[in-house]
Swiss-Prot record:
The gene is epd. Homotetramer. It comes from Cronobacter sakazakii (strain ATCC BAA-894) (Enterobacter sakazakii). Pathway: Cofactor biosynthesis; pyridoxine 5'-phosphate biosynthesis; pyridoxine 5'-phosphate from D-erythrose 4-phosphate: step 1/5. NCBIfam families: E4PD_g-proteo (TIGR01532), PRK13535.1 (NF010058). This is D-erythrose-4-phosphate dehydrogenase.
């Protein structure tokens, strides 16, 4: 039976989820029945079809009133600010993918359920009171039918968690630091303008800008044993897509760089195929645009110091990879049933 999905928020992730659904050939498994977005219908259709990062959508897209047509599929468009007023019950929605980047609390999830959805998946980190936080490929098997309010974590958490798991299982991680080198985002300014964060008052295209990150908290949410053993910082750089993560960990077992690369390469070809990829080609960030993997290890940048300090560089398309994991987690939530 085809899963009936609604999307709340049709920004970068919401639109990429729809594109990924059609490009991945999973329309027999998932049907988008409604999209809620405060923007007007014409703008929604236009930005789905034309995308600066990912190019022109291969499918025919047209908008008729409050309906969005993709090929022969019709999707109802909504413009409702109040979650409680959304018609999820009338639309028989199985799972809501909340891609607003605004909502993420348990109360927000309950509001979607009370509106008639059977389950909710947030496209960003939520509070500790959510039923589960999933990094697909690592812990989706922990999902239970009673888990109705779930977070898909963040794009950077999805990128780094598989690598941390692999290194910890093989070498035993003592502690680590992470630096996220992230493309500019919508909460930055085109030209200097006011923002509560004074660094984000500055033009995104002209500076490398340090920003706050909760990635360390995201790591410990998946692996509680690393509480107080990981720290993270983040900078935004003047590109529009693709992120690099510099991961440094101290490990218990002595190791050489080639052993680290061999571990990650084998994982990419085996247990983590489709989630982790590995390359030693001389590539740059744009080469990973539209890559569906959560993490792409750059083996040319692996270093080991003193046999116990490992440094690796991991790439991800912070939009496309994450959108594909949203679909994976949605199907995993459905596979365990509804209660």
């Amino acid at each position: 039976m085809t899963l009936r999905v609604a999307i709340n928020g049709f920004g970068r992730i919401g639109r990429n989820v729809v594109r990924a659904l059609y490009e991945s050939g999973r329309r027999a498994e998932i049907s988008v029945v409604a999209i809620n977005e405060l923007a007007d219908a014409a703008g929604m259709a236009h930005l789905l079809k034309y995308d600066t990062s990912h190019g022109r959508f291969a499918w025919d897209v047209r908008q008729e009133g409050e309906q969005l047509w993709i090929g022969n599929d019709v999707i109802r468009l909504l413009h409702e600010r109040d979650i409680n007023a959304l018609p999820w019950k009338a639309l028989d929605v199985d799972v809501v993918l909340d891609c607003t980047g605004v909502y993420g609390s348990r109360a927000d999830g309950i509001a979607h359920l009370e509106a008639g959805a059977r389950k909710v998946l947030f496209s960003h980190p939520g509070g500790n009171d959510l039923d589960a936080t999933v990094v697909y490929g690592v812990n989706e098997e922990e999902l239970r039918a009673e888990h109705r309010i779930v977070s898909n974590a963040s794009c950077t958490t999805n990128c780094i968690i598989p690598i941390i798991k692999l290194m910890d299982d093989a070498f035993g991680i003592e502690s680590g630091t992470v630096t996220t080198i992230h493309s500019a985002m919508h909460d930055q300014q085109v030209i200097d303008a006011y923002h509560p964060d004074l660094r984000r008052t500055r033009a995104a295209s002209q500076s490398i800008i340090p920003v706050d990150t909760r990635l360390a908290a995201g790591i410990t949410r998946i692996f509680p044993k690393f509480h107080d053993r990981f720290e993270a910082i983040a900078v935004r750089v003047p590109t529009i897509n693709v992120t690099a993560i510099d991961l440094s960990v101290t490990v218990q077992k002595p190791v050489k760089a080639y052993e680290v690369n061999l571990l990650l390469q084998k994982a990419a070809q085996g247990a983590f195929h489709g989630i982790v990829d590995y390359t030693e080609l001389p590539l740059v960030s744009t080469d990973f645009n539209h890559d569906p993997h959560s993490a792409i290890v750059d083996g040319t940048q692996t270093r080991v110091s003193g046999a116990h300090l490992i440094k690796t560089l991991v790439w991800c398309d912070n939009e496309w990879g994450f959108a594909n994991r949203m679909l994976d987690t949605t199907l995993a939530m459905a596979a365990i049933g509804f209660r």
